[in-house]
Amino acid sequence: MATYLEFIQQNEERDGVRFSWNVWPSSRLEATRMVVPLACLLTPLKERPDLPPVQYEPVLCSRPTCKAILNPLCQVDYRAKLWACNFCFQRNQFPPAYAGISEVNQPAELMPQFSTIEYVIQRGAPSPLIFLYVVDTCLEDDDLQALKESLQMSLSLLPPDALVGLITFGRMVQVHELSCEGISKSYVFRGTKDLTAKQIQDMLGLTKPAMPVQPMRPAQPQERPSVSSRFLQPIHKIDMNLTDLLGELQRDPWPVPQGKRPLRSTGVALSIAVGLLEGTFPNTGARIMLFTGGPPTQGPGMVVGDELKVPIRSWHDIEKDNARFMKKATKHYEMLANRTAANGHCIDIYACALDQTGLLEMKCCPNLTGGYMVMGDSFNTSLFKQTFQRIFSKDFNGNFRMAFGATLEVKTSRELKVAGAIGPCVSLNVKGPCVSENELGVGGTSQWKICGLDPTTTLGIYFEVVNQHNAPIPQGGRGAIQFVTHYQHSSTQRRIRVTTVARNWADVQSQLKHIEAAFDQEAAAVLMARLGVFRAETEEGPDVLRWLDRQLIRLCQKFGQYNKEDPMSFRLSDSFSLYPQFMFHLRRSPFLQVFNNSPDESSYYRHHFARQDLTQSLIMIQPILYSYSFHGPPEPVLLDSSSILADRILLMDTFFQIVIYLGETIAQWRKAGYQDMPEYENFKHLLQAPLDDAQEILQARFPMPRYIHTEHGGSQARFLLSKVNPSQTHNNLYAWGQETGAPILTDDVSLQVFMDHLKKLAVSSAC
């Protein structure tokens, strides 16, 4: 019998699913007492090189309110050619194509190893991929030049039949015609006036005029060229023209007086991009890619005025309700994001500037549409250039690692209901028998739209057990969930990926040990963290921390072993032992602590946390620390100030940053140049080892992390010192028998103090 850890890992590799609980409490009452909700992390398009898609359509349950897809959990009568749906128990006839099936000749979707299967839909014409570049021209010359080169490079990575468009903006917004041979022609819009989709389409001539009725000569072509073709052209037709056009882009000619910001019409430019695609390619996979080098300063969506002496809003301003433009700007971008999502398009934001660019107000554009958010200091850095290049990376079949216009549908057996989802999605408001009245995240529906996703995009799906306490589930009963993802593949095919999973029900009174052993503390920590971050968007920070603390105390009271009022007796089993320290680091993370971060930075961190898979999410919550020394090979060490020793090099991965830190002695040796002396070859290798490992992480991660090389006493050592558990501070540095390590100058409590308080509260009868 495989251990639960192996079972959890196998299921994640096969189905891209991690549940908080892998044995489910069999009644509503008991499930609410478990504290951590029954939920899962789902990676709908997890890469499976061993899973070739099947070239036929799925078989659906005939009950109109169910329509679940045939799967290995269904009961099959091979002689009568009938199958019983495992969700609603409807008996269904197999279609004629299945006439030859038998116990020894099963279709793939009935084999247990195909609990996840992908179908290629043959119906309907394939749709081309569409990329609409929206480019800020209020950049410094070297920044604009670097951006132009990156955009020209990206053209060579696109498939030849992809459609491409270009909008540029500064004080005015220009929509460039790409069909003119050798003539640059563009439509110019004022950057201060918002336009409706209808007005944009009328002005660009996208509404088809009535065709004049006249006899056609046989030689005349019967089809008029598409009205959209002036603005969106296949790359193979306009590759040279567009490369030249990008090369000729000039900085916005409008003069910027001293002490002023450039007039930047980001809100109108995005509005025109959304309106253009809305009128030409609704419900077709498309990416709007916004490149901006500063905050919107005029028109709808402006987040700050053009006076440089008035700084852009900070968290302090927001708390004091002193952010003048925030609410109106946020409303503008939310309206655009919802329109974009309704059309199945996604919006990426690439914001590179030293100051804030308005990501707080614009975050809903990528968050609701599944687009990317990239934040950097300049377009002329390897961080931006390599991150942008990785968007166009290919999979093992040579296809882009991106999918478009997806809908995710969740079906459950009758003892369960869907409470909601947290991730880069919007609700499709599909009510049904499996939709819970209690919402967690984006709820009130069993279907969500994810307009842009890749093989790592991960959603948190939350459930509610609705089975009543007095209606026991028979011994050995299993609950089932089916995830159905319809999407446009980057090869332009329509595909459906179906994942069907089941877990055992257990009676809490008699089988609590089984339920405990099947707790996945890593998945539970990430799922609870997602709930906390989701709440932090609308609630006060301290309230969210109090809520997380309360849940942790309740969980320890439920599953800890202890004697009342005796903290020393408190113990947690192995399947729960790491959970409190995940919560400790989560409380200190930039997702919940806004101190020392700008509103844009907080939005950026939260954006990535809401879409990454379990492994990356855990790194974000609790960074990984590796130690390099002469005492042995590199090894992971505790994220603790006691790990910072003079004769060590540390490598810390926080997901957003890779920090290499040289201990005091190592830094002195390096300054003395020992690594250049032949007799100290081993020291040279020691210095090189973390650089090689860091390079490996930098090559694989999206977005590319910020790379920081520092040493004891260096100003950037703060990145490491702010993350480690402050077990040694200026308060207890000289305690008797204290281990050597770096003292942290902080008033934050250490993990030890946090755990002592937790034990005290968990065992007290007052709680």
Curated annotation (Swiss-Prot):
The modification N6-acetyllysine is found at K564. Signal peptide: none annotated. The modification N-acetylalanine is found at A2. It comes from Bos taurus. CDD domains: Sec23-like, Sec23_C. PANTHER family: PROTEIN TRANSPORT PROTEIN SEC23 (PTHR11141), PROTEIN TRANSPORT PROTEIN SEC23B (PTHR11141:SF10). GO terms for molecular function: GTPase activator activity; zinc ion binding. It is a peripheral membrane protein. One of its GO terms (cellular component) is endoplasmic reticulum exit site. The keyword rRNA-binding does not apply. Keywords: Acetylation, Cytoplasm, Cytoplasmic vesicle, Endoplasmic reticulum, ER-Golgi transport, Membrane, Metal-binding, Protein transport, Transport, Zinc. It comes from the Eukaryota. It is found in: Cytoplasmic vesicle, COPII-coated vesicle membrane; Endoplasmic reticulum membrane; Cytoplasm, Cytosol. COPII is composed of at least five proteins: the Sec23/24 complex, the Sec13/31 complex and Sar1. Interacts with SAR1A. Zn(2+) binds at C61, C66, C85, C88. Gelsolin-like repeats lie at residues 634-720. InterPro entries: ADF-H/Gelsolin-like_dom_sf, Gelsolin-like_dom, Gelsolin-like_dom_sf, Sec23, Sec23/24_helical_dom, Sec23/24_helical_dom_sf, Sec23/24_trunk_dom, Sec23_24_beta_S. Component of the coat protein complex II (COPII) which promotes the formation of transport vesicles from the endoplasmic reticulum (ER). The coat has two main functions, the physical deformation of the endoplasmic reticulum membrane into vesicles and the selection of cargo molecules for their transport to the Golgi complex. This is Protein transport protein Sec23B. The keyword Cell division does not apply. GO terms for biological process: COPII-coated vesicle cargo loading; intracellular protein transport. Its main location: membrane. Belongs to the SEC23/SEC24 family. SEC23 subfamily.
